[in-house]
Design a protein with these regions (language model features):
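Cysteine-rich micro-motifs
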Residues: 203-217
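Short metal-binding segments enriched for Cys and/or His
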Residues: 219-229
Length: 233
């Protein structure tokens, strides 16, 4: 499957802030929220699904491996793409009450935030699913524990020429649906760099490296290893 034919003309306007921070809340937990002085930008988060999914998997990989700077990595991802909108597809209402946790404030407003543990777990689950596809992780005892699921809303217009309109309401759904279309494609465009191990997006079937630097570094490394074997001390 391909994301574009599945969701033609999909336009999901999403608001991100230029910087995020993690702060504890009086009711418990830590929340990823816009930083003081941050500015907002609204964009179509479904416009470039390839880099988006690759970056989501890369963050999931870092979190899965226990990166020491995981909070900084999450804040950087949010600054680039925005928060996930974890409750948006469920249609849960927002409130102006300043005493409630940030996740219940108006979506993507300056007061809105997401529990950092829930935020991180979404990326870890996505990456672990990718590992099962790669054959590097076998879920036991129940294979379905690694399955991914989500909400898919639509609207069918009335009249002589009805149109099917997908109503995707969150960045989380865009990531999940884009990933699903890519990972189930005949030629999977999500790859792991042969040199650095980074997950990247490339539609060329024979692509093995995330960039020229890694390709050159790997070739030099292979050349030196062959030279060492051919000319032992």
């Amino acid at each position: 499957m391909d994301f574009k034919p599945m969701f033609p003309s999909l336009n999901v306007l999403w608001t991100r802030w230029s910087a995020y921070q993690i702060k504890p809340h009086q009711w418990g937990g830590e929340y990823l929220i816009p930083a003081e002085g941050a500015t907002d930008l609204t964009y179509n988060c479904a416009e470039q699904p390839g880099p988006l999914v690759a970056d989501a998997l890369e963050l999931g990989q870092q979190l899965h491996m226990g990166a020491p700077d995981k909070n900084r990595l999450c804040a950087a991802f949010a600054a680039r793409y925005g928060l996930l909108g974890l409750n948006a597809e469920k249609g849960e209402g927002a409130t102006e009450d300043p005493n409630v946790p940030p996740c219940y404030r108006p979506l993507n407003s300056w007061e809105y935030g997401e529990d950092v543990s829930f935020f991180q777990s979404n990326f870890v689950m996505l990456y672990q699913h990718f590992l099962t596809v790669q054959g590097e992780l076998v879920p036991t005892p129940n294979p379905r524990v690694m399955d991914l699921s989500g909400f898919l809303s639509y609207r069918l217009t009335s009249g002589p020429n009805p149109q099917l309109v997908w109503e995707v309401r969150s960045l989380e759904s865009v990531i999940r649906f884009a990933y699903a279309s890519m990972i189930s494609a005949e030629s999977i465009p999500l790859k792991v760099c042969k040199n650095c191990g980074k997950v990247y997006y490339n539609t060329h079937a024979k692509s093995e490296f995330c960039g020229t630097k890694c390709r050159n570094y790997y070739n030099v490394k292979v050349f030196r290893e062959k030279d060492r074997i051919s000319h032992p001390d």
